[in-house]
Amino acid sequence: MNQEVMNLFNPQAPAQTFDSIRISIASPEKILSWSYGEIKKPETINYRTFKPERDGLFCARIFGPIKDYECLCGKYKRMKYKGIICEKCGVEVTLSRVRRERMGHIELAAPVAHIWFLKSLPSRIGTLLDMTLKDIERVLYFENYIVTEPGLTSLKEHQLLSEEEYMIAVDEFGEDQFTALIGAEAIYELLASMELEKIAADLRVDLAETTSDLKQKKLMKRLKIVENFLESGNRPEWMIMKIVPVIPPDLRPLVPLDGGRFATSDLNDLYRRVINRNNRLKRLIELRAPGIIIRNEKRMLQEAVDALFDNGRRGRVITGANKRPLKSLSDMLKGKQGRFRQNLLGKRVDYSGRSVIVTGPELKLHQCGLPKKMALELFKPFIYARLDAKGYSSTVKQAKKLVEKERPEVWDILDEVIREHPVLLNRAPTLHRLGIQAFEPTLIEGKAIQLHPLVCTAFNADFDGDQMAVHVPLSLEAQLEARVLMMSTNNILHPANGAPIIVPSQDMVLGLYYLSIVAEKEPGEGMIFADMGELQHALENKVVTLHTKIKGRFKTVDAEGNPVSKIYDTTPGRMIMGELLPKNVNVPFDICNQEMTKKNISKMIDHVYRHCGQKETVIFCDRIMQLGFAHACRAGISFGKDDMVIPESKAKIVAETEALTTEYEQQYNDGLITQGEKYNKVVDAWGKATDKITEEMMARLKAVEFDPVTGRQKQMNSVYMMSHSGARGSVNQMRQLGGMRGLMAKPSGEIIETPIISNFKEGLTVNEYFNSTHGARKGLADTALKTANSGYLTRRLVDVAQDAIISEVDCGAEIGLTMQPIVDAGQIVASIGQRVLGRTALDPILHPVTGEVIVEAGRMIEEKDVEIIEKAGIQSIRIRSALTCETRDGVCAKCYGRDLARGTPVNQGEAVGVIAAQSIGEPGTQLTMRTFHLGGTAQVVDSSYLEASYEGTVKLRNRNVVRNSDGNLVVMGRNMAVLILDATGKERAVHRVTYGSRLFVDEGDTVKRGQRIAEWDPYTRPIMTEVEGYIEFEDLVDGLSVSETADESTGITKRVVIDWRSTPRGSDLKPAMVIKDKAGKILKLSKGGDARFLLSVESILSVEPGAHVKAGDVIARLPMESAKTKDITGGLPRVAELFEARRPKDHAIIAEIDGTVRFGRDYKNKRRIIIEPNDDTIEPVEYLIPKGKPFHLQDGDVIEKGEYILDGNPAPHDILAIKGVEALASYLVNEIQEVYRLQGVLINDKHIEVIVRQMLQKVEITESGDTGYIPGDHVDRIELEEINERLIEEGKKPGSGNPVLLGITKASLQTPSFISAASFQETTRVLTEAAVAGKMDTLQGLKENVIVGRLIPAGTGGMTNQIRRIATARDELIIDERRKTSGSAEANAMLVDMTNNAAE
């Protein structure tokens, strides 16, 4: 086979292609067939002659020659003896390269168990033999005998016997009556004698009969492994090795160092150990040594082989000379430094260089400046070729000399070579695909790469010493892809949200903002200009300034392209900017006739891109950048310390707040409020004070002042300009500079009660400085930790989504998701238009008034449609989604919708999974790197009232209100909502109002915008009565279940329920309040239960026993958690928790059915709650709730399916089980978006949907039917559907399953591709499982193909694959044709069909 390595005369056929890779357990015969000879000696090389020892680990006879075409003794040299085997040294004369591919073997004197199959959990050998790992190890490591053939004795099969027991048994029954063996031989015998078919049949019978869950699971595990062996053709006894393969010597090299020492691969040490022990064992057996010695040697051999395969998996780690653990075969594959991730997934490439970057403002967007020195080095081969072609040199050597001397003709040629040859620039960390872009190089002097300022956002680069790498695409295809797909001019939009990413920032924004300012009373106000010439003239002669109010004529074109003009009220600065706008009917002057903040500039660029296309946009961006820089420079904006204005009213506000806090302190001392309430109120008061001061400060900064002498408007405050324009800085930072720093958070996340009153301009006091170090340190520590976390999250996301590729145009799905605007505390955070833009409509979208069709079903919703939808006030739209897409592998283009980075429908072959993963992962890293910018300044996020966001009429859904003693309307319903309807009766806003809120409006009232609708206490949760009567306490015993704190000075007492289970006497109490009538009878509630209110721990009682209460009065309050600061620190782990589908710590309990709440008998420390269904066909459901948990439902409350019985974050699995896939999707999307939204990061919903789709691919079989699966198996959803369709056609019984939600790590490890899973995590476990099952990897995803070195099946690679498939099919047809030669007509027809399809 290896003879034909380099047959020059008939070059070998190109390496055969393959479509799949299979992994299985190697049988001894297989290992022998690979081997070129047995290694008998542990020697490596002769230390005097440096030649390999014969039969040693580097033996040339077995592995091949050391020098090309030269045998070891030197008798045969050179090509002419190719293939001859030297009779003296036995070495074949061939290429030395074969030393990388030829393997050897070691014949073991005693069998040993393969550690992967023994110790990789669950132990395969253990499961097969139905023995525990401990027992097997006892046998393997020669502690116990095992009975293999009990014969007619009373012993049982698989029974373990110690040395003494064995002796007794031999004495009792005689040696030939039974067989008991020890060591790996025993296990080998047991495995070899297994009849797998019979075992499988028995297990199936047992499975059908067993009732216990535990036993069922155990049987299923065993059945699975038995079936794996049967299907894969592996034999169980192959898990015990009699022959160990030895890998080729060049893969475990021995390198001479200077000074006569050698560096060697650890594997050589491990192999040496095995050979030594093996040889010793052979000798001992020949010498007929005592059993105990042989046994010890066998055990040592087993340990040596274990260490070779997986060092440290069992027993102590074997260390080398320097106390460092030796790297075994497993370690070579594992982890970041292992083969998979180090060399297969990421390789270092040639033709690359790196250097520092500097800004290149005079470059065009598609250019980058490349230092001449670098270019010369990178394009060397091209230069050599061109020098030769032009006749400057005749050999490569001459060319080299020319280039080294840097002769003038070399530079000319370099210019030619570089022209139109794009290079790739990359900045680490490459967090999304915009981290690598193509540019055309222009040669520059100096040694730094010049980068265009507008692409810095995409690379997240700045010029404070960042470095970038340059790569040269060599092949024509690579150059083509770089130019067409990766050129910076083709990446104008951000793939995460479709907004422009080539947007001016910092100085450019400041310059454009300055240009667009309007000032009053400037010279020349009211002048009218006909064209730019006049205007320039006036400006140069200082007749007008850039900010004067003038009338100007703006020239553009109409729809036919004829020039038209219109006069606008504007300023000269804006006219200059308007001059740069592309001439297009859809680009009016209005888009730049406004204050140019960063947001508006972004909108303007987006507008130009949508209406004028890419080329115009690129030119426009370049021009606008030049303009921004020029005017930022001319304006000369900078700021000094007096630009930070401290508001005069600061002292007053601080004094007022201090008075308030003293008052709260007093109230607390008087016992009117609890410690927690005081803390909340103080923090609240200071939060409000900080906001007030900030407002005053901003008002001062914004204020327009006039010069008393000239009457002209004074220059705007520079700090305000920078912040307001979005160039640099935020209101938050300005507040810390000129207002007051405000509240700080402790490292634990709690807010410190005393705020920092000073600002940076005044300087902090020592105490304040100390308090603020908390936040600063936490910020720095966070940054370091979170970068790693975020990178890991991205890695898991990419891994789970890598095979989501657009594989067809339309899957024809008839299901989708319902999109609604996201409303938070009455504010619309994401409008319906933003959410449906670029998605495909599932049903026709109709106008609510006229009923005309706005968007037909199956059409993509564009910007123009969104405008109509928003105007019509449509509140919910059904759209197609990747989540509900029915494509077999991948996603279809219709369900995905618009490709955000291009603004057009998505192309086939686009790797949407990876894009989704990058879009979600990238901000994670950036946010975490930005935590400390707030310096830990706390924000209190709590709203305690609700204002109307629209005008309209009020309608109460599920109205349940009463008037309490104070005459206020109080909400008594658990799921009540306030709706605001417009004149046509359309819903304009929906607000959930919580139980216990005070309502200021009632059904049918009209409200104005901004009017208060309701308010509530954000810090406590009330328990209210709905009947009138007299209070009586039950089981509220002082000191046991209630503690009473009295205040000496006022005598006011406050009762708080304490944990009554902590004392033995109190364990049976059920603290509650009941309401009785005058006669002392317990009143009934409207639902029929008694008016008894059970109290949970920490409830504060608001009434005395015997007090008279009315409906709607609060009888007790439950304090809520105190306000913690919200910051992405909570955010990143939260995102990971959602994607990993973990159960949150105190998760909510969700009602599974509609019904009425009843309290059952309590356990010791759990409360039993029963929901009695409204529907008699359903069984009642019970829940157990820990007694200490704050619990707000009362006996007799009506509850709907999906409502929370116990508050908290719901577990996603529960949502999936109770409310279904759509509810789960919307929950995950909204929760994840919430985290990013807090940080102001925009991510399109579809990215999150793609990831959730990958998490929902499996179903758990509940009814197996005739599918051949076992209940509890995880199967692909689409696979099950296909099998069921087939079974129904054949009239058999289909199987059914429930969708399961897998976390991203779990889902990655469950991919059908074992190569992908092994390169992700837990390499040994994945490979062991795959080998036992004899898995086949069909190379469908991206990762597998990268690893085996093929084009990925996405993008251009996808097309190549498709073409190749068609070609092979056609080739096969043609070959068949030739065989038949009859040339049947139908085959011809098929051929024509296929050719046509291919052409299409």
From Swiss-Prot:
Descriptive protein name: DNA-directed RNA polymerase subunit beta'
Record's cofactor remark: Binds 1 Mg(2+) ion per subunit.
Binding annotation for Zn(2+) 1: 71, 73, 86, 89
Residues bound to Mg(2+): 462, 464, 466
Binding site for Zn(2+) 2: 811, 885, 892, 895
This protein's UniProt keywords: DNA-directed RNA polymerase, Magnesium, Metal-binding, Nucleotidyltransferase, Transcription, Transferase, Zinc
Cofactor (UniProt): Mg(2+); Zn(2+)
